């Protein structure tokens, strides 16, 4: 064989070898395929980012923000249940011929600035948001192809609210973008017809719900998909397992998306990604499954209420307590605000969000990316809650009341002589402590004036090398 022939022969041989090699491994997201059954879907591992995030912001906004009276269930309470205060409100403020649909053009969102919202959410210390893309009234905050003349492009704002907020969140913050979606609609004729057939007919999910869900995921790629409002229909009616199989296997967010447990009658607290179990769910003890406490700053409503007084809002102390209790017991806190019809975040909501952010700047180490500890709540000092970071050999004791004696008694941590160290987050200097005779330790807190305190509303001790 002549030397010049070698290159010509080498190429076919190399090609043959490449063809004989095994194919490269598939990307991680397609390594596991999920069947459209709860058994298969429930086995999906929740993306790690969600448990690490701990704190999110819920945003209830829609046409119900126009009357902004009583509740975001205004339409239902007025027209279906005919609750007197809602009926009287309409009689006193609107002409007799006024319909709920007439609120649509009044939902102007004229002061809505997605960048301002994003900056406030970033300042809150939250790690994800969830916006109501469609509530039970059926009005969509994007130009849904399946909600003719009852969406934010055709009516009211005449803007794609979902897109504007998605872009702002992803361009200006490190938060994950999520969407809430109501499966059913109170007064949609197709849903009512299906309901009258005991859900043997499936016109509504086939022509409305499922197409909109696919549209939302493909167009806006939410990393939280927060389902709600099954209308009493089972998951088979909604084809929830079929949709979730697509979401986990094929969708553009298949590797990072998290979902909740509201996918049909009987699924709540039983099937899905993380459990919500009920509104304002806060069990106060450890659960075996990842869960979320969705709750409201306004004690009585998810949507904005013009008649709310200052005592109707949770204080920052109460909100910090909710966060600490929830995270100590393995949950995430999803804290709700309700913007006005103009698209502004009211001063009281903004203040609470910024206060949470200032608290988390000091104490976030004891919240973000933490794990539950062997004890959640101290028995000697009940206002103490625990989190941990096992790899760093850290336990955090978050206490909500500063003891007047300057001594904090902790009944659960056991010190290791010569190894244990205690620090107050935001203070830095190691603190003196002594072991108690039975169990636990007593920590000598630093003597600080109110202006020297690293934060208000709650404090955290970092305990290194305790058992």
Swiss-Prot record:
<dbReference type="InterPro" id="IPR016286">
    <property type="entry name" value="FUC_metazoa-typ"/>
</dbReference>
<keyword id="KW-0326">Glycosidase</keyword>
<dbReference type="InterPro" id="IPR000933">
    <property type="entry name" value="Glyco_hydro_29"/>
</dbReference>
<keyword id="KW-0378">Hydrolase</keyword>
<dbReference type="InterPro" id="IPR017853">
    <property type="entry name" value="Glycoside_hydrolase_SF"/>
</dbReference>
<dbReference type="GO" id="GO:0070062">
    <property type="term" value="C:extracellular exosome"/>
</dbReference>
<feature type="glycosylation site" description="N-linked (GlcNAc...) asparagine">
    <location>
        <position position="239"/>
    </location>
</feature>
<dbReference type="GO" id="GO:0005764">
    <property type="term" value="C:lysosome"/>
</dbReference>
<dbReference type="GO" id="GO:0005788">
    <property type="term" value="C:endoplasmic reticulum lumen"/>
</dbReference>
<feature type="glycosylation site" description="N-linked (GlcNAc...) asparagine">
    <location>
        <position position="377"/>
    </location>
</feature>
<dbReference type="InterPro" id="IPR031919">
    <property type="entry name" value="Fucosidase_C"/>
</dbReference>
<comment type="function">
    <text>Alpha-L-fucosidase is responsible for hydrolyzing the alpha-1,6-linked fucose joined to the reducing-end N-acetylglucosamine of the carbohydrate moieties of glycoproteins.</text>
</comment>
<dbReference type="Pfam" id="PF01120">
    <property type="entry name" value="Alpha_L_fucos"/>
</dbReference>
<feature type="signal peptide">
    <location>
        <begin position="1"/>
        <end position="28"/>
    </location>
</feature>
<keyword id="KW-0732">Signal</keyword>
<feature type="glycosylation site" description="N-linked (GlcNAc...) asparagine">
    <location>
        <position position="171"/>
    </location>
</feature>
<keyword id="KW-0597">Phosphoprotein</keyword>
<dbReference type="InterPro" id="IPR013780">
    <property type="entry name" value="Glyco_hydro_b"/>
</dbReference>
<dbReference type="GO" id="GO:2000535">
    <property type="term" value="P:regulation of entry of bacterium into host cell"/>
</dbReference>
<dbReference type="GO" id="GO:0006004">
    <property type="term" value="P:fucose metabolic process"/>
</dbReference>
<dbReference type="InterPro" id="IPR018526">
    <property type="entry name" value="Glyco_hydro_29_CS"/>
</dbReference>
<dbReference type="GO" id="GO:0005576">
    <property type="term" value="C:extracellular region"/>
</dbReference>
<comment type="subunit">
    <text>Homotetramer.</text>
</comment>
<keyword id="KW-0964">Secreted</keyword>
<feature type="modified residue" description="Phosphoserine; by FAM20C">
    <location>
        <position position="301"/>
    </location>
</feature>
<comment type="similarity">
    <text>Belongs to the glycosyl hydrolase 29 family.</text>
</comment>
<dbReference type="Pfam" id="PF16757">
    <property type="entry name" value="Fucosidase_C"/>
</dbReference>
<dbReference type="GO" id="GO:0004560">
    <property type="term" value="F:alpha-L-fucosidase activity"/>
</dbReference>
<dbReference type="GO" id="GO:0005615">
    <property type="term" value="C:extracellular space"/>
</dbReference>
<keyword id="KW-0325">Glycoprotein</keyword>
<protein>
    <recommendedName>
        <fullName>Plasma alpha-L-fucosidase</fullName>
        <ecNumber>3.2.1.51</ecNumber>
    </recommendedName>
</protein>
<feature type="site" description="May be important for catalysis">
    <location>
        <position position="294"/>
    </location>
</feature>
<dbReference type="GO" id="GO:0016139">
    <property type="term" value="P:glycoside catabolic process"/>
</dbReference>
<dbReference type="GO" id="GO:0035578">
    <property type="term" value="C:azurophil granule lumen"/>
</dbReference>
<dbReference type="GO" id="GO:0009617">
    <property type="term" value="P:response to bacterium"/>
</dbReference>
